[in-house]
Design a protein with these regions (language model features):
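Class I SAM-dependent transferase core
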Residues: 2-54, 58, 62-70, 83-100, ...
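Conserved nucleotide-cofactor-binding alpha/beta core module
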Residues: 46-166
């Protein structure tokens, strides 16, 4: 994380707060995760330089850059075109050759590029999407995802062994909702 300048991923009016350990607002109701949470989620993936990682929720691109420092290839899905474009521009300026960004429904993953060694979801889901589980590498693929209701979730790590999926709760957390076919229907609570 020390290699990635968090301030360049923030709106200019938030740059002074870049190294505060807190989530900060971006645009369109989205946030950049607090550094502590970025560290916990990244560590839970147990990344290696040869790994192929799928990130759901590009957002500002900060977490994407952290993943790219540790993994061989990073594929990142963002549902909001404006965020994807801004993140792509920032990451290009920082010269990351191993990042691929696409706009789409993150709850469905990126099946054309599967399988992945690790999948990181940066939005809270009502359950673990089956599409994402299916895209994990069969021999130890890891998925880290916030699961719960719209107000509080548990950060869950799922590990795949063949057709079996073990899971463990890591800690309580709160994320913006994962919207999509296998996520929430609307950004607001019912």
């Amino acid at each position: 994380m020390g290699e990635v300048p968090r301030e360049v991923f923030l709106p200019p009016e938030r740059e002074r707060q870049a190294y505060n350990d807190q989530a900060l607002p971006l645009t369109q109701g989205q946030t950049i995760s607090q550094p502590f949470m970025v560290a916990i989620m990244t560590e839970a993936l147990a990344l290696e330089p040869s790994h192929r990682v799928l990130e759901i929720g590009t957002g500002s691109g900060y977490q994407t850059a952290v993943l790219a420092e540790l993994a061989g290839q990073v594929y990142s899905l963002e549902r909001i075109q404006a965020l994807a474009s801004r993140a792509e521009m920032t990451l290009r300026e920082l010269a990351y050759p191993n990042i691929h960004i696409q706009v789409g429904d993150g709850s469905l993953g990126w099946p054309e590029e599967a399988p992945f060694d690790s999948i990181l979801v940066t939005a809270g889901a009502p359950h673990v999407p089956e599409s994402l589980k299916a895209q994990l590498r069969e021999d130890g693929g890891r998925l880290v995802i916030p699961v719960g209701d719209r107000w509080v979730q548990d950060l869950v790590r799922v590990v795949r062994r063949g057709n079996e999926f073990g899971s463990e709760n890591l800690l309580a957390c709160r994320f913006v909702p994962l919207l999509g076919e296998e996520g929430w229907d609307t950004p607001e609570a019912p």
